[in-house]
């Protein structure tokens, strides 16, 4: 059994959902896309999804994530019962749904010592030409991630590499699949 079979991708917000879709559809990984926007979830097609009811995006306000998660207890229960050993938390650092929920969920997943999981945040950084609030959200998310003990590898995806975000997501998916599907690591 390779690491692929032990992994799950939790895609938060619009960016994380698109990344999770790529890994689920193109490489056969287990995963789920999570968002408050039904429109964003619908655009992802036929993959596992969870709608954060009552929150159609946070409008740039990461602090709404605490209220959102507390009002979606069934989603927190789902997260608590994830059995895979390696969990990748995918999100756009500049967004508010992903960057706000990701740090809370990453900490929650990594603190459950009974499950002995490896939790790996994957933060996509905003492009240099994006609004200052996007950079502020990403900065706050990175600061919060640094304070979480026991994290696995943290991946940073640089959106300044290319304006073709599909290409960036495809490249990351290919590289992570090459690593996780290699039988030499088991």
Region locations from a protein language model:
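Tubulin/FtsZ superfamily GTPase core signature
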Residues: 1-186
